[in-house]
């Protein structure tokens, strides 16, 4: 074209998943309304052909990330086809050693063992909320085989970390001491989060067994594991559970898992709840990815007592991001400054307020 061209506008046309958002939630509290709406937008931005952690960096589906996303999506969108398609992709993972790969799909050899255990949680929650048992019917043998693979590593009642192998990354969350060492042959030790997640995976597998008309299989093994967790990791002086056998490291996340798996019981659980919900507790704080486990733990201890704590904590953290100009929620509270300037400003695992608002807030409409 020889004539001059005048560019009137440059832009992007969104191509979004065509979900039907049923009865958008309306709240009396304007801050919570803004948080909820931004969480829903964050979820939408992380939905393409499957759930993805973020829309600009890896664009990959991880088990922990997608567990948070799926649970929130059940409430925000009231549909299950997208979650099922994502779970089918995970269920067809072909890890050469039987453990799930770091994300789906991939031919990358790296694995995060704890993430394999979140898959059991995802399968249970999908079944519970959708009422569809055909997915767990189809992949029950895979669930059983993967759980048995983890249990085959148990030594003296506990599972050690995945040591001496660079293809395993002992990652739990992006917080001090819990992010592991990628591409490293770590030394052997026993980790509280891994053992608690294994205990929870046994509960989730027995739930699926009951749904499928099978007898429970893991109740005794779970009880024995919980006893060993309590014996090994509990620090009576602090009234807390330490994260590792080789160090005095205490986190909100690890202690929350001790409550959720049933290792912390009775007065010990109550004390843990008081400490992990305290403003100044000297514990490694839970990140946005795992704060939900802290919320679940204290709500399991006493829902009436801790509901305001959960809602207030969400107000503070998510209100901070909104005040900083967020139009979608971040990977961590450090925003783009994290990871050497590569922090994600739109991360699906941070949409968890959706679930807690439906659980605890008064919703209109």
Give the residues covered by each predicted segment.
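Extended acidic/polar, glycine-enriched regions
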Residues: 1-34
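Short loop/turn segments at secondary-structure transitions that flank enzyme active sites
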Residues: 2, 16-18, 49, 96, ...
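Structured secondary-structure scaffolds
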Residues: 25-81, 90
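Active-site core of glycosidic bond-cleaving carbohydrate-active enzymes
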Residues: 61-77, 81-365
